[in-house]
Amino acid sequence: RGVQEATGDFILVQDADLEYDPADYLPMLEELGRAERRSVYGSRPLGIIRDCGWRWPFPGRHADQGLGPWVMNIVLVSLFLLLFRRWITDSLTAYKIYPTALIKSFSVKTCGFETDHELTCKLLKAGISIVEVPIAYEPRSLEEGKKIRPLDGLIALWTIVRFRFVD
């Protein structure tokens, strides 16, 4: 419903769980002003590499992040690279800036976490550049209310394949 109500030039998405630092929107907005026909995503893996360095064997993995979500993100990165020839390091980020008119023009068919992937696929198919900016990230545990589950990873894979070839 938020997309329908949006009136500005851009839609800014922010997760409400405070895993992210709102100050990270400033570099995202700065990046947005550099060129047209783009969307900006905050990248948690790039932020972790920026803040902690390239830690072998799990680069881009937060010390408090489970191995499963990190591995699934590597699979998603690989799938975007294979299907779209684009390196998207964090399609599930909850820090995104979209062009309002373009997002309103899409017929969104999903709900839930898979909408992130549907919109990313549609942006790439429309020729919109997705620029990623490193952001800070403090992951929550299941006990603290983390919502994403292993099934969501499988749904994400299907969603990316589906929207690469359909709609």
Language-model segments: what does each one mean?
Residues K146, P150-W158:
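Non-catalytic, C-terminal membrane-associated alpha-helical segments of glycosyltransferases
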